[in-house]
Amino acid sequence: MSTFSLKIIRIGITLLVVLLAVIAIFKVWAFYTESPWTRDAKFTADVVAIAPDVSGLITDVPVKDNQLVQKGQILFVIDQPRYQQALAEAEADVAYYQTLAAEKQRESGRRQRLGIQAMSQEEIDQSNNVLQTVRHQLAKAVAVRDLAKLDLERTTVRAPAEGWVTNLNVHAGEFINRGATAVALVKKDTFYILAYLEETKLEGVKPGHRAEITPLGSNRILHGTVDSISAGVTNSSSSADSKGLATIDNNLEWVRLAQRVPVKIRLDSEDQQHSYPAGTTATVVITGSTDRDPNQASPIVKLMHRLREFG
């Protein structure tokens, strides 16, 4: 074989290797940038902000921060003697007006029986008016008593659901105002994932598609199902000025950043029992209508999936 032929073969092999490398790089780039996945995903859960409905001194806090509590379990207690005294006073008012109403009822009935032969019509009407006034006062006293009873019941703040108390920032002896958040309750078995997918990766993603969730720093893979895709996000390029006219930011036409859209993913029931707090980060891969079988994937595909954790 001549020297010229060997050069042609070497050049052909080199070009073929370069072409294969370009194709491989393009495939990897397309797989990495266009397939529906994101490293910007967060564990999320239903959180209840616990705030008292009454004001007063906190007398007891029988729970600890980050403790798992049951529904109805006492979280903290507010100054009960003060509200017990208010209820006793309200009950005394009710008893007083009940007695007064009964007395005025007898007096009005007696005057009605005697009639205008024994007294004037004006006196009869006045007696009826006094009776109606006392009845209204009794109704008001009953309402005040019921409210005092409700306030006393709400001096004991209980967990509205099973979950973990967190960010407990109240202690016995402190004064707390009505409506002031005292602790957050992370409800158990309500965890889900919010995956912020780029808009270029949303095509083909539908509710019901399966998803793989890999927590940051872990090799464990959780599974879930796409629940919904957000119907809208804030338009950061547009706002209104003081006169209501639209203000549009200037953008470079050749640089367009893809907007991220929240995709809600329900965790499978068996994966609800995990140790990852709400707010922690995860990588999410949408696998389509079925779960991906890791045993059938080629080493290159496995490497690509693993590279997502680092890129």
From Swiss-Prot:
It comes from the Bacteria. It is a single-pass membrane protein. The chain crosses the membrane at residues 11-31. GO terms for cellular component: plasma membrane. Keywords: Cell inner membrane, Cell membrane, Membrane, Transmembrane, Transmembrane helix, Transport. It is found in: Cell inner membrane. InterPro entries: CusB-like_dom_1, CusB_D23, MFP_Efflux_Pump, PHBA_efflux_pump_AaeA, RND_pump_MFP. Coiled coil: none annotated. GO terms for molecular function: transmembrane transporter activity. HAMAP family: AaeA. Belongs to the membrane fusion protein (MFP) (TC 8.A.1) family. Forms an efflux pump with AaeB. This is p-hydroxybenzoic acid efflux pump subunit AaeA. The lineage of its organism: Bacteria, Pseudomonadati, Pseudomonadota, Gammaproteobacteria, Enterobacterales.
